[in-house]
Structure formats: C-alpha cells, structure tokens
C-alpha cells in the first residue's frame, strides 16, 4: 500500500500516462499484482524450507516458472497474448544445489516446453527422451557445462482464427510479428531489444532486410506446422 507508483512509472516509457484508460489501469492494479507475487514468494519459501528441514533440498530440482506474463496496461494492453516482453518473458529459476552453481544467465533462450527433455536429461533419462520431441534438451547449459547458444528462434502464435491474428518469432536480439485481418497482412512489427528494451520503436520500415529474413524464417515454420497463415506472407 506504500508503493510509490509514480516513481515506478517514471522509468517505464511503455506505461501510458496517468489519466488515460490503460495508464489508470496499471496504477490501480499494480499494488494488487505485487501483493499477489509476494504471496507466491512466501509460499514457495514454505516449500523450500520443508525440503531443507527434511534433508531433501540439496538433491531436489526445483523449477520456478510461469505460463505467461501480463502487460498490466503497458503498451495499452491489459493482459497477455501479445508479443511484448511483459507478456512473453517469464521467470525461469532452476535450483539444484548439489549440481548447479548459483548464477544468472540472461542469454540462454529457453521456453516452457524445453523443460520436458531438459528435466528428463538432468534426472538421468536422456535416452528415454522420445525422438518425436521437437524442443531442446538444455541440460548441459543449465548445469553450466556448455556455453553453446541455441540459435533457434522461438515462435509466437496468437489468432482469432487462421485468417486473423498475429504470428511472429523471437530471437536473442529481436522480436518480429505480423498481423493479418481476413487473410491480408495489415501490420508488421520489428523491435531490436538490444537498443530498445521497452519495445517503443517499430523499426520494420527502416529494416527491410531484417523483415525479409524473419519473414522467410517465419513462413518456413508456419508451412512446417501446417498453418495456413503461411500463405499470407510474402515469399
């Protein structure tokens, strides 16, 4: 209740101004949001303390993550299902004191679906990972035994139907998305997050070479996954 909301907004160019619909939405709800995640933190702490008191913590893999983020008014968006970092980025904390040294890795591209093969491998079941699994076993990166980066982009799908909605991809440096309405592309978005972390400057118009590159990658993936949206994209 004592949070200085305006001080928080002062360093966030993506938060709309006070007095606007989404600006007020953020200011009215951010305290509740922080109260919620504080409660989550306290209860995760209870689990950790129980593991420690039973002598299980050192050799237990604990994963703290989430299925999605939330915009909370940023970019004039209230919820999720959008390509902005507030929606797409999630916490990913992996603890295994006996095997993983504490560190922060901001460059490892990992998605929720990668946990399946990665956890199997960490637990000694690498050979049991089905050949049909299309996501990445990142166990060596998690253990700090490999600095090899996974360069495969992660793809983004949000649709009202197959003819309307967004498709896109996210690399380690860029976010790319296209929108179609009734089968016609009507918006292209490209952000360089290394220079524009709050995604305020759409550089699609100034970077046709990158648009072509990402468009080609995206189209190939959509064809691979039998998504008819691929036919709306230029070759």
Regions found by a protein language model. Give the residues of each.
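Active-site-proximal cap/lid insertion segments
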Residues: 1-109, 122-132, 178-185, 194, ...
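Non-transmembrane alpha-helical segments in soluble domains
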Residues: 34-37, 41-48, 52, 116-120, ...
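C-terminal cap/loop subdomain of S1 sulfatases and analogous C-terminal strand-loop tails that border
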Residues: 68-74, 101, 108, 113-116, ...
């Amino acid at each position: 209740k004592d949070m200085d909301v305006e001080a928080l907004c002062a360093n966030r160019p993506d938060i709309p101004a006070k007095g606007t619909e989404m600006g007020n939405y953020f200011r009215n709800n951010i305290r509740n949001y922080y109260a919620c995640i504080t409660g989550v933190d306290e209860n995760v702490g209870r689990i950790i303390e129980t593991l420690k008191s039973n002598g299980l913590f050192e050799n237990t893999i604990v994963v703290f993550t989430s299925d999605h983020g939330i915009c909370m008014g940023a970019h004039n968006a209230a919820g999720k299902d959008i390509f902005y970092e507030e929606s797409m980025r999630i916490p990913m904390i992996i603890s295994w004191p006996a095997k993983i040294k504490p560190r922060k890795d901001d460059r490892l591209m990992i998605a929720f679906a990668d946990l399946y093969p990665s956890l199997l491998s960490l637990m000694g079941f690498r050979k049991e990972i089905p050949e049909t699994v299309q996501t990445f076993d990142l166990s060596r990166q998690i253990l700090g035994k490999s600095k090899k980066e996974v360069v495969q982009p992660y793809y983004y799908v949000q649709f009202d139907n197959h003819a309307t909605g967004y498709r896109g991809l996210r690399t380690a440096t860029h976010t790319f998305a296209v929108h179609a309405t009734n089968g016609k592309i009507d918006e292209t978005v490209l952000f360089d997050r290394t220079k524009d972390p709050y995604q305020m400057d759409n550089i699609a118009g100034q970077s046709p070479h990158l648009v072509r590159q990402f468009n080609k990658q995206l189209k190939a993936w959509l064809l691979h996954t039998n998504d008819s949206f691929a036919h709306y994209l230029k070759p």
